């Protein structure tokens, strides 16, 4: 689900933190991609002309494999080295959100049964799309045969993507979920796995610029995201994005906001704090997520296993052999040329903390004063 209204807040208050670029701008970059989110996109977007999912002669869905194969090739063609990260076991705190999703599925199934037009049927069918265990396993098999590394995260894929970026294993995390910023990835790439026909630029969000622009610590930013609405718990009823930002900037933490509301000082009877609100547990899931230490992960891109890849996609899944062989040639060529990398890829760029930035600003101010005094002394001697 991500964070409700966060993109709008960043766009309004810190537009400089979002850079829109063509895919070619990321030549030589390694990127950790939220695989579960990508598969969901492929199942929705990769369709037949009649709007139905792609299937082979046996009736098996192949939209996810078609999307994974060709979108990965597009990245490789443009010199990007992708690594995919799959979701592990969801945190217990997410169970309420998963229950809500199940309830919505039941409601959607009812609407589908009542639909009278093809357009309405298609709309409801897309809402029922769900990434299954089989979809994940088939995608992992495909990536293994393509020579593309993948990781199964202990819990949330976005958290593991951010960990790889923080440890310098990749340049950025790629996901449509804005909650990836809560894990303090240096950079978040959105729309990376979109179809080329959409002509949608890639949005690169700089987390440190977001924090500085909003004048928030990472802890306050996470509290803001919980206030806006995340997958782990409810938010304060009656508080919208504008008010949530104002409350965090005024009071500094959810604890202080709760005190402010419960004391009656807010004079707002519409604000309702959820009972037994687990915001502290939600906060820790963002600030200290369960991940595999990025330093222990060695990402390796290997030549594709041509024979096995053709057997899997063409013999088993009934893909066009001519197109698959063409794709394999692109894959081999792209992985070879992508080895060149970028000059800045030889250096690990460590994002500065707020404290480091403040210290640097103080030093700059002191140097300015020192130079000013030197100029005064020089003028006096004249």
Curated annotation (Swiss-Prot):
I-domain: annotated segments: 120-251
Keywords recorded for this protein, A-Z: DNA damage, DNA repair, DNA replication, Endonuclease, Exonuclease, Hydrolase, Magnesium, Metal-binding, Mitochondrion, Nuclease, Nucleus, Phosphoprotein
GO biological process: base-excision repair; DNA replication, removal of RNA primer
Single annotated GO MF: 5'-flap endonuclease activity
Subcellular location: Nucleus, Nucleolus; Nucleus, Nucleoplasm; Mitochondrion
Residue ranges, annotated region (Interaction with PCNA): 339-347
Binding residues annotated for Mg(2+) 1, in chain numbering: 34, 87, 156, 158
Post-translational modification: Phosphorylated. Phosphorylation upon DNA damage induces relocalization to the nuclear plasma.
Protein name (database record): Flap endonuclease 1
Source organism of the structure: Saccharomyces cerevisiae (strain RM11-1a) (Baker's yeast)
